[in-house]
Amino acid sequence: FDKLVFGDAGWGDEFLIATLMTLLVSILSMGLGLFLAIITVWAKIIQNRITRFIANFYTTVIRGVPELLVIYLIFFGGNAVVMSIAKVFGYNKYIELNALTIATIAIAVISATYSSEVLRASYLAISKGQIEAARALGMNKFSIFFKVISPQVIRHALPGIGNVWQITLKDTSLISVTGLVEIMRQSRISSNVEHSP
C-alpha cells in the first residue's frame, strides 16, 4: 500500500491520473461506439443488400481481428490517411494526431461491433405485432420508434451493454501503445521503478 501514498512518497497521484485517463477513454469510446453501433444496426436491418453486407463485413472482421491490431491500424493508418488528405489540399508538413483521439476512436470501433450485435438482437426480440398495432393506430415512423421500439430495445439491451462496457474497460489496457498512460501502464511503470510488483 506504500505505492498508493499521494505526493513524493508514493505513486498515488500518478495512479489517480491514470485511472481518470482509463475512465475518460472508456466513457468516450462507449459513447462513440454506441453511436456507431446504432448506424451499424440500422444498416443491418434495412432491406438493402449492400449496406447489410458492409455492416456484416465490418462486424465480422473487427470482431475476428485482435484488438491490439485494430489499435495499431487506426494509430498508424490514421496518420497516413490524414497526411494523404492534407497533401491533396497542398499541406505538406507532418501532422500528428492526438493520442487520446486515436485511442478513443480505436476502442470505439471495437466496442461498436459488440454493441451492434447486442442492439440488433434486442431489436429482433420485439414482436412485429406491436409495430403493426402501432401502425394500425395511425402512429408515424418516428412515434413508433420513440414510443414503441426504443423503450423495449433499451430494456432488452441493458444487460448486454453492461458486458460491452466491461470489454471496453478491459480494452483500454491496450491503449498504452498510443503513448497514453492508463492504469495498467502506470502500474508497470511503478513496478519497474520500485522493483516490486
PLM region spans:
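Transmembrane alpha-helices and adjacent helix-loop boundaries
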Residues: F1-P197
